[in-house]
Each structure stands twice: as structure tokens, then as C-alpha cells.
């Protein structure tokens, strides 16, 4: 039975709508059509979350929408699916006709999209109850599937039969996990069971869409909760993780298996994508590199480099951008590298990693330590001292990269060096001497060094 009621929490829905969304809805209603705020924008309004884009659904067919807004710039963004974008004072307002969908032969997209007679029919095609509500400009709410109740109980629940919803579109499986992770919700029991039963539907989803959802899970407040609960789903597109689950490290540094240790590291890193991904992959090669040493303990010689190699293959397969791949692999490669607290060593690491990744590496090392046995927690103090030293070096404007040098390649050419790769090699040699403290980053002293080494006359 249809449940229409005033929104108690928001007596005046207008207070949460943009002026241009109000203009669009009023124009539609004044010309005899129904207009509703719907989907994620209404969900976020009900949850007191910020809303940037307002989705409007209407009884008006696309051509009628274009007539109603004939004095506005109208973009027929998706006429086939009933979507028209109206520019109201340069703000794009998307208006979609009530519609129904049927047939999902590819497990992702509907074979047929047709216009529906009512908003109730439109809401029935949506994925989750919290996204299947609609509200008119006067505050009249249509909530047929208990979306408000599920929001109050912090539950992700499909509209109707969960198996049907996930069989229609495999992406909904990841969306359910992502919504739970980002909102801090639980997935309702029947919906959760269907996710585990139909995980294979993810194989029909493009890498780009998988990555878009997975990144949001990784950047949520407590990703480990959802990576643990849905590890079978994650392993469908990152099968390399499967060997880590339950893998006993047999080492006194560790009280957790590789996967549980990894989850703790992920949770303890700041919410930066490259850092969280590096945390996920930092020990992924441990099952491959494992061996029992003469001391009777498990060892993982070379696992940092091997994990970086595996991370690169995984990220390329999932079509991550090159910058992210480079950052993640660099952090994984050096996560187990011991950094001595000396200006010379720290400058060399700053030179090798760059300022941002150097501090990201320290964050990864801290998180890695928190995932180990408590008896080694004293290393947090060592890492804190390293950070203090690095920040002091930066505050002193110490030279640790070519851009900081008091002499440039153009200067070497003016001093008589021939243009070519030798210029770069000479600059690197000078930088190395400056970092090691052999010479100062002073133009005259650098030129004197060039003469002493025979680089110039």
C-alpha cells in the first residue's frame, strides 16, 4: 500500500533544495505535471548530508519537458532513457521521466526501458530502499519500501527480491558494500546472503566501475569491516588476496595471519587512496615468499619488492591511472626499508621518494607497526623522531633535489659543458656531494668542485 506522509524531519523540503531545483519543480507542477526529488539526493536530505546534485523525476515525457522549459537552454542528454538536462541560471538540473526497466541479458543494463505511468512504478525499479523514495515540493513523501525505516535502522536493503536485483545488475553488489562502508550501515541479512551467493555477477562489471566503487570502500572510515565481511567478493577481482586469508606467519613479530594483519594496517592509515591501496598490497606476496629459517621462524625475504611487482600487475589489470600505480608501488617497495635517523639518509629518501611520499611512507610504517605484536610498539617513537628530523630539514630549506641546487643545467652549458646527458650526470654527482655534506649548496663552491673533478676547465 502506498505510504504518503509529510516529512516530519523536514517540514519545509524547500530549505534543502537549491533555488534552481525549486524553479524546475515549480515550473513542472504549474504546467500540470508531477515532479519529485528522488534517489540519492532525497536520501542525503533525509540523512542531513550535503547535497550537490538534485535528481528530479516527473510525469512529463522528454519532449514535454523540453516544451515546458523552451525559454531555457535544454540539453537532450539521454532522450532514449527519458533524461533531459535543463540549465537554470547555468546550473544543470537533470529531469527524468518516470520509467520502468526489464530484461538484463548482460547482467548490467536493461534490455528495455519504457516510460511508466506513476512515480510508484518508477521507484520499484530502483536498487535499495533508501534510494527508492520520492518527495514533492510540498513535502509529500512517497516511501513504498520502508526507506525511511531502513535509514533509521542503518540498513542497506534491496527493493524487492535481492537475488533478482543483483542478477539484473552485478554492480549493485559493490554498491551495496560501498553504501554500507561509506554510511557506516549494515547490509540486511537477506541482501547480504544474496551478495555472497551472486558474487560472480561482478565478473560482468567493467574494471572502471569496479574501481570507482572499490576506491570509496577503501576510503571509508573502517574499510576492514567490509573487506573482512565481503572478502569473497573482493577476491573475485583481486584473487591474489585469497592466499593471504588465514596464512599463519609463524613469526614472533606477528600475532595475526597475513590478511588480518593487512586489514589492521589499512584501518590505521590516513584516508588517502594511494596509501590505503599500498596498505592493502604491502604484504600480498608473503605466502609466495614464505620460508622457515634456521631459527624456526617464518621469514619473507624480498617480499617488499615482490609485493610491489604484484601490486603493479593488479592495479594495471584494474586500469588504475599511472600516477596512482607509481605511488602505490613505491610505497609498497619501501615499506620494510629501514631508514636511519641521519640528515644524510633522510635527504636521500626525500630525494628518492619526494616529500609527499616520504611522509606517506612513514604513515604506512606506523600502520604496519600497529598491525604487529605489541612488544614492537616502541618503533612508533623511532618513526616520530624520523618525522621530526625530516620536517626540520624541510624547514631549513636543505637541498635534497635538483630543483634546490644553486646551479642548473643552463649554468653548466654557459660554463663550457656540451649539451647532452653528461649534464644530468654531473648535476646528480653534485647533488650527491651536497647531500652527503662534502660540499655546500653554494654556486661558487659547486663551480670549484666541477673544476676539481675536471668537468669544466
Residue ranges and their predicted role:
Residues 1-457:
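Catalytic cores of the polymerase beta-like nucleotidyltransferase superfamily
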Amino acid at each position: 500500500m502506498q505510504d504518503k506522509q509529510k516529512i516530519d524531519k523536514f517540514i519545509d523540503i524547500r530549505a534543502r533544495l537549491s533555488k534552481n531545483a525549486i524553479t524546475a519543480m515549480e515550473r513542472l507542477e504549474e504546467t500540470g505535471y508531477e515532479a519529485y526529488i528522488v534517489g540519492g539526493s532525497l536520501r542525503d536530505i533525509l540523512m542531513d548530508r550535503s547535497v550537490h546534485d538534485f535528481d528530479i523525476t516527473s510525469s512529463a515525457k522528454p519532449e514535454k519537458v523540453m516544451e515546458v522549459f523552451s525559454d531555457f537552454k535544454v540539453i537532450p542528454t539521454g532522450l532514449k532513457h527519458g533524461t533531459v538536462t535543463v540549465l537554470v541560471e547555468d546550473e544543470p538540473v537533470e529531469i527524468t521521466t518516470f520509467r520502468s526497466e526489464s530484461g538484463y541479458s548482460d547482467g548490467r543494463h536493461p534490455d528495455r526501458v519504457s516510460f511508466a505511468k506513476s512515480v510508484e512504478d518508477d521507484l520499484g525499479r530502483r536498487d535499495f530502499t533508501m534510494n527508492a523514495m520520492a518527495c514533492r515540493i510540498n513535502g509529500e513523501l512517497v516511501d513504498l519500501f520502508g526507506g525511511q525505516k531502513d535509514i533509521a535502522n542503518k540498513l542497506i536493503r534491496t527493493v524487492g527480491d535481492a537475488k533478482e536485483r543483483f542478477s539484473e545488475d552485478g554492480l549493485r553488489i559493490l554498491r551495496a558494500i560501498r553504501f554500507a562502508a561509506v554510511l557506516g550501515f549494515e547490509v540486511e541479512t537477506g541482501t547480504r546472503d544474496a551478495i555472497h551467493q551472486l558474487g560472480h555477477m561482478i565478473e560482468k562489471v567493467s574494471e572502471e566501475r569496479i574501481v570507482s566503487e572499490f576506491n570509496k570502500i577503501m576510503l571509508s572510515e573502517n574499510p576492514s569491516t567490509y573487506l573482512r565481511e565481503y572478502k569473497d567478493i573482493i577476491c573475485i577481482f583481486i584473487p591474489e588476496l585469497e592466499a593471504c586469508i588465514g596464512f599463519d606467519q609463524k613469526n614472533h613479530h606477528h600475532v595475526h595471519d597475513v590478511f588480518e594483519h593487512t586489514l589492521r594496517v589499512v584501518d590505521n592509515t590516513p584516508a588517502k587512496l594511494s596509501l590505503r591501496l599500498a596498505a592493502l598490497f604491502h604484504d600480498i606476496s608473503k605466502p609466495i615468499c614464505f620460508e622457515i629459517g634456521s631459527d624456526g621462524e617464518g621469514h619473507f625475504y624480498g617480499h617488499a619488492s615482490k609485493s610491489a611487482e604484484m601490486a603493479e600487475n593488479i592495479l594495471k589489470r584494474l586500469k588504475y591511472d599511472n600516477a596512482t600505480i607509481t605511488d602505490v608501488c613505491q610505497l609498497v617497495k619501501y615499506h620494510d626499508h629501514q631508514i636511519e635517523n641521519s640528515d644524510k639518509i633522510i635527504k636521500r629518501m626525500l630525494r628518492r621518494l619526494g616529500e609527499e611520499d616520504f611522509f606517506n611512507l612513514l604513515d604506512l610504517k606506523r600502520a604496519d607497526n600497529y598491525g604487529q605484536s605489541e612488544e614492537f610498539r616502541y618503533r612508533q617513537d623511532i618513526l616520530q623522531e624520523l618525522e621530526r628530523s625530516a620536517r626540520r630539514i624541510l624547514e631549513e630549506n636543505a637541498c635534497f633535489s635538483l630543483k634546490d641546487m644553486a646551479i642548473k643545467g643552463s649554468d653548466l652549458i654557459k660554463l663550457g659543458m656540451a649539451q647532452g646527458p653528461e649534464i644530468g650526470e654531473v648535476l646528480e654527482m653534485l647533488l650527491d656531494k651536497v647531500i652527503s655534506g662534502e660540499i655546500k649548496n653554494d654556486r661558487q663552491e659547486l663551480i670549484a668542485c666541477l673544476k676539481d673533478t675536471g668537468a669544466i676547465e
